[in-house]
Amino acid sequence: MSEKSIVQEARDIQLAMELINLGARLQMLESETQLSRGRLIRLYKELRGSPPPKGMLPFSTDWFMTWEQNIHASMFCNAWQFLLKTGLCSGVDAVIKAYRLYLEQCPQPPEGPLLALTRAWTLVRFVESGLLELSSCNCCGGNFITHAHQPVGSFACSLCQPPSRAVKRRKLSRDAADIIPQLLDEQIEQAV
């Protein structure tokens, strides 16, 4: 019978606490720590005051392809890949740091971030398994999440070519410098 390291267990508890505070689901905690399911549930209840949410994790790449989700996922993924390439961190530590950068850079609505930590972690797994990748936009040059093996030079991001429903959803700014270009864009669209 092998003895568990007290130091490793303390690290796992600290990691689990950090992940829970960032909104991780139980499946992510089980995958990234060596703590038992029972201990993770007790820790989750102690920190959040309620049991962890039940249900399956997202398993489709389609969520990351819709326009607004793609922008958020791409921001996170670019931060994650930068951290990996520079060697500043790796593994789940890179996911946590990239997610914190994403939260700092994207103003969050009251109902919470568009890209939850568990979904960001799922994105990393999709990228690592080759289902998704970052492709360069042929208009702006930015790197955005696409399905794997996107033909080079054929991708235009949803910032350069937003879907029509994205334009309808946009609200006019109160700042006069912003209103004039928005009104001109809408007049051109109506004329066409």
From Swiss-Prot:
Post-translational modification: UMPylated on Ser-31 by YdiU during infection.
Cofactor: Zn(2+)
Traits of the deletion mutant: Double knockout with flhC decreases invasion of host cells.
Modified-residue entries (O-UMP-serine), positions: 31
Function: Functions in complex with FlhD as a master transcriptional regulator that regulates transcription of several flagellar and non-flagellar operons by binding to their promoter region. Activates expression of class 2 flagellar genes, including fliA, which is a flagellum-specific sigma factor that turns on the class 3 genes. Also regulates genes whose products function in a variety of physiological pathways.
Annotated cofactor note: Binds 1 zinc ion per subunit.
Family: Belongs to the FlhC family.
GO biological process: bacterial-type flagellum organization; positive regulation of DNA-templated transcription; regulation of bacterial-type flagellum assembly
GO cellular component, one term: cytoplasm
Superkingdom field: Bacteria
Binding site for Zn(2+): 137, 140, 157, 160
Quaternary context: Heterohexamer composed of two FlhC and four FlhD subunits. Each FlhC binds a FlhD dimer, forming a heterotrimer, and a hexamer assembles by dimerization of two heterotrimers. YdiV binds to FlhD which inhibits the ability of FlhC(2)FlhD(4) to bind DNA.
Swiss-Prot/TrEMBL keywords: Activator, Bacterial flagellum biogenesis, Cytoplasm, DNA-binding, Metal-binding, Nucleotide-binding, Phosphoprotein, Transcription, Transcription regulation, Zinc
Summary of activators and inhibitors of this protein: UMPylation of FlhC by YdiU inhibits its DNA-binding activity, which inhibits the expression of class II and class III flagellar genes, and interrupts flagellar synthesis. Switching off flagellar synthesis facilitates Salmonella escape from the host immune system.
Keyword Nuclease: no
Location(s), subcellular: Cytoplasm
Record gene name: flhC
Protein name per its UniProtKB record: Flagellar transcriptional regulator FlhC
Nucleotide-binding recorded as keyword: yes
GO molecular function: DNA binding; zinc ion binding
